[in-house]
A protein has these predicted regions:
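Conserved N-terminal catalytic core of the sugar/cofactor nucleotidyltransferase
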Residues: 2, 6, 14-96, 104-108
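Short acidic donor-binding/metal-coordinating loop in glycosyltransferase active sites
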Residues: 99
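Conserved core of the sugar-phosphate nucleotidyltransferase
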Residues: 105-189
Length: 189
């Protein structure tokens, strides 16, 4: 991006002229379904103050900082360990979501999250959200849909494919059996 820089990456920018950054829009999207005191943000230590500036109702202990940029898995593991220690044996619903998604139908999104919470309360499952692809895209991961889950508008995951080449992406879209991987995961601890 021409505007995004190391000192202020895209999640801290107001791309749409709304007066809200992508991070602020993400927090706003989750407020109706997750109390602010239950939200943790994992970020690089260099962005700690920027997070607290943009989300002033977060306490400093809700911003978990990694000393160096790594991939997503260590960040998720760090946050889950923290949630586990905070929950003191009681269960906790966990949603992992990036701070740079654009979601236009936020009410529909929140309904889906609430449905996922209900599902994981009754089932030992990890839920991931997929989106119907509109074109072959080599920059996204894909989820191959498996069998439908009885009584739910959900299906099991048959396979994940990370960023396929164009030929494979075209086959995925043509088959109708694949979704784009949103990177949003929901489960119960």
């Amino acid at each position: 991006w021409p505007f995004s820089r190391n000192e202020k990456p895209k999640q801290f920018l107001d791309f749409f002229g709304t007066g809200r950054s992508l991070l602020q829009m993400t927090i706003d999207r989750f407020r109706p379904v997750v109390p602010i005191e239950n939200i943790l943000i994992v970020t690089n230590v260099a962005y700690r103050e920027l997070v607290l500036e943009q989300i002033p109702d977060l306490r400093s202990n809700q911003v978990l900082c990694e000393p160096a940029r790594r991939n997503t898995a260590p960040c998720i593991a760090y946050a889950v360990a923290r949630i586990k220690s905070m929950s003191k044996g009681s269960h906790a619903n966990i949603v992992v979501a990036a701070s740079d998604h654009l979601i236009l139908q936020e009410d529909v999104f929140r309904d889906v999250i609430a449905k996922c919470f209900s599902f994981i309360e009754k089932n030992d499952a990890l839920v991931t959200l997929g989106m119907k692809p509109t074109r072959p895209e080599t920059g996204y991961g894909y989820i191959q849909m498996g069998d439908e889950v009885s009584g739910e508008a959900m299906c099991k995951v048959k396979a994940f494919t990370e960023k396929p080449n164009l030929d494979l992406a075209e086959k995925f879209v043509e088959s109708g059996d694949f979704l784009w991987n949103s990177g949003i995961f929901i489960w119960n601890l």
